Every structure is written in structure tokens, then in C-alpha cells.
């Protein structure tokens, strides 16, 4: 990939609480919109931006846009192995919460908060292959892969 790979402890994308148009997490980038815009201004200088994000405990694929709706890049949020994810916290409300995030946040293209796992990333000149791998248990050294979701991200191209 010809561009910039950025690591972030927290989601950079703008997340709103459904219907309220208020920041989801003011202790993350949501609480620092001016600083996020300064970061985006620098990232706009790069041909293609791919952000790897952790500490959300769920899987995400997000398009990043600045305040003027200019495409900045794609953000990949990796799932947790042992930390609580959406289903651990909200149980049967998980599907509704995930659907709400996608509906209310145009930049969120996909999310998964039901399974534990990890993310594999293969970078080539033409694309980034993102594979979210989920396991049936994290309480044993013996586990099975129960699902994997693959996505191809093209340089400087929003996820549709």
C-alpha cells in the first residue's frame, strides 16, 4: 500500500449516540473534535490513510471524514480477546445497538460486538485485506475459529 498506516489507542471516527447528535465517548476522540480536525489536516497530505484502532473491544470498519465531509481514510477497529464487548455489557440489546450505530453514524460501515478474536491485516500495493477472526472461547487454550469476516480496502477509497 502506498500511503500511511496509523496506530491509535482509541477510535478516531466521529460517533454519535442515536438520535441525540451528541458525542458517544467524550474520553476518546469524540471529546476532542478540534484536535481530531488538526490530525485530519495533516493526514490529508498523505495519498492513502489506514488507521488501526484498539481499545474499543469490538470490531469496526469506518470511513473517516473531516468536518467538511472530505474523505480522510479508513479505520479498522480490532476486537477484544478478553475485555468485555457489547454483548458482555448489553446482552440481547447488542443487535439493536450495532444497527443503531450504523444507522446514526454514516461513517460506521460495519461493526461486530458479539465475539472475541483478533484481526489479520495483509497489505499489498493494490489493497489491504482485513480479516476479523473470531473464536468460540477465550477461557481455554483449545479453541476453534467460528467465524471470519474479510474485507478488501482499496487505497484512498471509502468503504461502501
Language-model features, listed with the residues they occupy:
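Short catalytic/ligand-binding loop motif for oxyanion handling, primarily in non-cytosolic enzymes
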Residues: 13-17, 58-62, 84-85, 129-131, ...
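Short, well-ordered beta-to-alpha junction loops that form the rim of enzyme active sites
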Residues: 8-9, 54-56, 133-135
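Conserved beta-sheet core of the metallophosphoesterase superfamily
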Residues: 26, 30-101
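A short C-terminal boundary segment appended to hydrolase-like catalytic domains
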Residues: 106-160
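Beta-sheet entry/capping signal
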Residues: 8, 48-50, 73-75, 118-120, ...
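Short Pro/Gly-enriched beta-strand edge/turn motifs at strand-loop
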Residues: 3, 98-107
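Single conserved hydrophobic/aromatic residue that forms the stacking wall/gate
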Residues: 1-14
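A solvent-exposed, charged loop/short amphipathic helix patch at secondary-structure junctions
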Residues: 13-27
Amino acid at each position: 500500500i502506498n500511503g500511511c498506516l496509523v496506530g491509535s489507542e482509541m477510535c478516531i471516527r466521529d460517533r454519535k449516540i442515536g438520535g441525540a447528535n451528541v458525542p458517544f465517548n467524550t474520553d476518546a476522540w469524540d471529546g476532542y473534535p478540534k484536535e481530531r480536525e488538526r490530525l485530519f489536516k495533516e493526514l490529508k497530505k498523505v495519498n492513502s490513510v489506514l488507521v488501526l484502532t484498539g481499545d474499543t473491544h469490538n470490531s469496526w470498519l469506518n470511513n473517516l471524514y473531516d468536518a467538511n465531509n472530505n474523505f480522510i481514510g479508513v479505520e479498522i477497529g480490532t476486537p477484544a480477546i478478553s475485555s468485555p464487548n457489547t454483548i458482555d455489557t448489553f446482552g440481547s440489546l447488542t443487535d439493536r445497538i450495532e444497527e443503531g450505530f450504523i444507522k446514526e453514524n454514516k461513517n460506521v460501515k460495519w461493526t461486530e460486538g458479539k465475539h472475541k478474536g483478533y484481526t489479520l491485516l495483509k497489505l499489498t500495493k493494490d489493497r489491504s485485506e482485513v480479516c476479523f477472526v473470531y473464536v468460540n472461547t477465550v477461557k481455554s487454550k483449545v479453541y476453534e475459529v467460528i467465524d471470519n469476516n474479510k474485507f478488501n480496502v482499496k487505497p484512498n477509497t471509502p468503504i461502501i
